[in-house]
């Protein structure tokens, strides 16, 4: 769990490789917030498409080798940003970041489902979510802090490359902790092949046609609950996009706060989110109706965003409310992951998590340029209104998922 957590934190760190230093890119290359938001769309489109495909790759070759390749992409992305000469370089970096991010959820959840007992999975999912939030929390502090200390944003990205390289080395050194305990059995012929050999020896043809096997591998895509889970991730991560990427500029425009407040908001939001995930891990292990936990937690976060969007409070209070919204977001996390596990057919873990979590990438990809457009057109309150609306839609979708799963158990 520890190695998976560190790797997961790194992937979330690289979600925010670009946004904390958006002002530096505006100054260096003369870019707009819409253009910068489009960079995040490139990142998450590549990641979303790659994530769905990575689930099949993880099921076929194993999680750990895929994880190593992903971390290598992060190293390359940070080095490209460090040497960037314009917008095109940043687009290339966004593509590399997306390729690196794509395999993480199918790989991580495959490892956790293979290595952690069912009784401890709720806590494992909680720890996994916490590590992601810590990665998000660390990125603004690391990048803005190192940039300020060195007097150059390029040095900050060299530091990010070294960080990803260190985690890559950790994964290589700890490969035995990540490979499934039955790894040796994976190299033996699967049951269908063994049955075919036995049937051939008895004069029967028992092997499945290749086309039938492929259709069977895609059968999980017919499950309506799978696409509800995808939709849940889509709307919830649209809310996260507002906070992570544009809360700083929006607070500056709405309340006159300095742009440096963005680091405080994102870091505070993610740290309280991590605390929420600790508590949420216990809730997910004790409360059967997971959608109720999700509904209450995210409704509270949405309410706080509505207050911030009104402009009726002081700047420091607005910052505090944004940070406090992270607690509700975090509380919902472990219940969300357990809800998806209940919806996952046996033997399709990598494929399901890859498909469902690509909704995360799709949500970020669509939301980022929209929120950037709102800022460019003088509508900072729309950033917080959009976050509130997205969380409330997530509450509704979670209720639908819970209802479908309850009917399936009857």
Regions found by a protein language model. Name each.
Residues 50-62, 277-289, 375-376:
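Helix-to-loop junctions at the C-terminal end of transmembrane segments
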Residues 60-71, 285-298:
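Cytoplasmic membrane-interface "Motif A"-like loop-to-helix N-cap segments
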Residues 128-179:
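Helix-loop-helix hairpin linking two adjacent transmembrane segments in secondary transporters
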């Amino acid at each position: 769990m520890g190695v998976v957590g560190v790797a997961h934190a790194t992937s979330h760190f690289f979600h925010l490789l670009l946004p904390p230093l958006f002002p530096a890119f505006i100054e260096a290359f003369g870019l707009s917030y819409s253009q910068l938001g489009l960079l995040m769309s490139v990142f998450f489109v590549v990641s979303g498409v790659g994530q769905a495909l990575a689930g099949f790759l993880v099921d076929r070759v194993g999680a750990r080798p895929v994880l190593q390749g992903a971390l290598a992409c992060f190293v390359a992305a940070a080095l490209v940003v460090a040497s960037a000469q314009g917008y095109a370089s940043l687009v290339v970096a966004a593509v590399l970041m997306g390729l690196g991010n794509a395999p993480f959820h199918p790989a991580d959840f495959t490892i956790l489902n293979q290595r952690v007992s069912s009784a401890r999975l709720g806590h494992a999912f909680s720890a996994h979510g916490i590590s992601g939030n810590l990665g998000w929390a660390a990125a603004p502090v690391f990048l803005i802090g190192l940039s300020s200390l060195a007097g150059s944003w390029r040095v900050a990205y060299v530091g990010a490359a070294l960080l990803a390289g260190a985690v890559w080395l950790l994964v290589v050194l700890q490969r035995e902790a990540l490979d499934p305990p039955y790894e040796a059995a994976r190299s033996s012929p699967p049951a269908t092949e063994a049955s075919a050999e036995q049937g051939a020896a008895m004069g029967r043809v028992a092997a499945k046609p290749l086309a039938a096997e492929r259709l069977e591998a895609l059968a999980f895509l017919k499950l309506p609950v799978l696409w509800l889970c995808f939709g849940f991730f889509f709307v919830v991560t649209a809310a996260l996009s507002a906070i992570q990427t544009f809360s700083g500029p929006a607070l500056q425009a709405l309340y006159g706060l300095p742009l440096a407040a963005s680091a405080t908001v994102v870091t505070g939001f993610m740290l309280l989110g991590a605390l929420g995930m600790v508590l949420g891990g216990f809730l997910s292990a004790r409360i059967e109706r997971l959608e109720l936990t999700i509904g209450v937690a995210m409704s509270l976060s949405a309410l706080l965003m509505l207050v911030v969007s009104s402009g009726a409070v002081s700047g420091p209070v607005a910052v505090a409310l944004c940070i406090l919204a992270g607690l509700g977001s975090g509380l919902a996390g472990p219940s969300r992951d357990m809800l998806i596990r209940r919806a996952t057919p046996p033997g399709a873990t990598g494929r399901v998590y890859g498909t469902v979590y690509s909704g995360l990438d799709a949500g970020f990809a669509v939301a980022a340029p929209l929120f950037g457009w709102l800022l460019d057109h003088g509508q900072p309150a729309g950033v917080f209104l959009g976050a509130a609306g997205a969380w409330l839609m997530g509450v509704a979708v979670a209720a639908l998922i819970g209802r479908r799963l309850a009917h399936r158990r009857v």
